[in-house]
């Protein structure tokens, strides 16, 4: 049998690394959609996924089918029955096993051309040398302090970063691409390539956004996320949703923010109720929500890697009750 890796090369228009004839055949439909240059960029990209929950399984599915070079999974969580409701890669026989290693077989069946690695690595031990290996890092973690730590590493090493999580019928993602360049073709003859630059903020900076600059359409989950982040940055843990002292501290954080940003006539209770709602539903994943948010995040990852169109900057909020999605920049 001919080794696909040894087949002749189909060079990209930019003269860089191209696709083998075998790859060009496998990814024919994708190439027709976004072009051979974009597919070649995907085939050179390496994506690190931290936290392999139901939402992340949807994101991974979309990225693997798109045809990246390799993915790395980091999550030593032991599977329980509660993990089965929205996860694409595990079943009842998976209970009691490590979620990252248990997901490998199902992922490999989606696209055998993608290399899959599993790392038993704690966020605390991740360093510049480790992060530099990747084109992009995607994380789903309940501890927002962990999210901020990984984001800082990515930002320092100019690695694209996405955080995404779902909370029952709600979901969101945040992206930090530092200084992101993308290229478009003009409609003139002959067509010219135009370069565009988008500037992104870090997760920490966005969480410190001035609440007084928000408006009535600003999604309540943003305020809740900011409140939870302030707690977790201080304690390096997620608040206990049945702890009176933790809930009391969350209330104090909200009141302090209202005072800090001079938000007169503001009902602090609506922010507190939203914060409690996100906290209570942090471990609840619903399949349709994961599929919708995961599809959007997957599409963003493809746009980021291929650099051929504008990307969302920097928050996306999905509300499954209203059936609406909203992009905001904080």
Curated annotation (Swiss-Prot):
Keywords, in A-Z order: Nucleus, Ubl conjugation pathway
An example Gene Ontology CC term for this record: SUMO activating enzyme complex
Pathway the protein acts in: Protein modification; protein sumoylation
Annotated localization: Nucleus
Pfam families listed in its UniProt record: ThiF
Protein origin, superkingdom: Eukaryota
Any one Gene Ontology BP term: protein sumoylation
Gene Ontology MF annotations: SUMO activating enzyme activity
Listed InterPro entries: ThiF/MoeB/HesA, ThiF_NAD_FAD-bd, Ubiquitin-activating_enz, UBQ/SUMO-activ_enz_E1-like
Similarity comment: family membership: Belongs to the ubiquitin-activating E1 family.
Function description: The dimeric enzyme acts as an E1 ligase for sumo. It mediates ATP-dependent activation of sumo and formation of a thioester with a conserved cysteine residue on sae2.
Assembly information from the UniProt record: Heterodimer of sae1 and sae2. The complex binds sumo via sae2.
Listed name of the protein: SUMO-activating enzyme subunit 1
């Amino acid at each position: 049998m001919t080794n696909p890796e040894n087949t002749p090369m189909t060079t990209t228009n930019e003269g860089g690394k191209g696709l083998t004839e075998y790859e060009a055949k496998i990814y024919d439909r994708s190439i027709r959609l976004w072009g051979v240059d974009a597919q070649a960029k995907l085939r050179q990209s390496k994506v690190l996924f931290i936290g392999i929950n139901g939402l992340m399984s949807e994101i991974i599915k979309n990225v693997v089918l798109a045809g990246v070079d390799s993915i790395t999974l980091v999550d030593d969580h032991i599977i329980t029955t509660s993990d089965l409701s929205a996860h694409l890669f595990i079943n009842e026989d998976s209970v009691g096993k490590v979620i990252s290693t248990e997901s490998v077989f199902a992922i490999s069946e989606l696209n055998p051309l993608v290399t899959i690695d599993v790392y038993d690595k704690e966020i605390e031990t991740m360093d510049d040398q480790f992060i530099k290996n990747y084109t992009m890092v995607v994380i789903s973690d309940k501890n927002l302090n962990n999210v901020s730590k990984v984001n800082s590493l990515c930002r320092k090493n100019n690695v694209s970063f996405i955080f995404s999580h779902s909370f029952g019928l709600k979901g969101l993602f945040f992206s930090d691409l530092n200084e992101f360049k993308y290229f478009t073709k003009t409609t003139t003859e002959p067509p010219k390539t135009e370069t565009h630059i988008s500037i992104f903020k870090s997760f920490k900076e966005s969480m410190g956004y001035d609440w007084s600059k928000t408006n009535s359409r600003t999604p309540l989950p943003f305020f809740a996320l900011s409140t939870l982040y302030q707690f977790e940055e201080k304690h390096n843990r997620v608040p206990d949703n049945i702890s009176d002292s933790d809930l009391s501290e969350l209330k104090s954080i909200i009141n302090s923010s209202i005072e800090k940003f001079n938000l007169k006539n503001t009902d602090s209770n609506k922010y507190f109720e939203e914060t409690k709602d996100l906290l209570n539903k942090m471990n609840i994943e619903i399949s349709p929500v994961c599929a919708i948010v995961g599809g959007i995040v997957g599409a963003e990852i493809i746009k980021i890697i291929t650099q051929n169109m504008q990307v969302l900057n920097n928050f996306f909020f999905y509300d499954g009750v209203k059936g609406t999605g909203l992009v905001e920049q904080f």
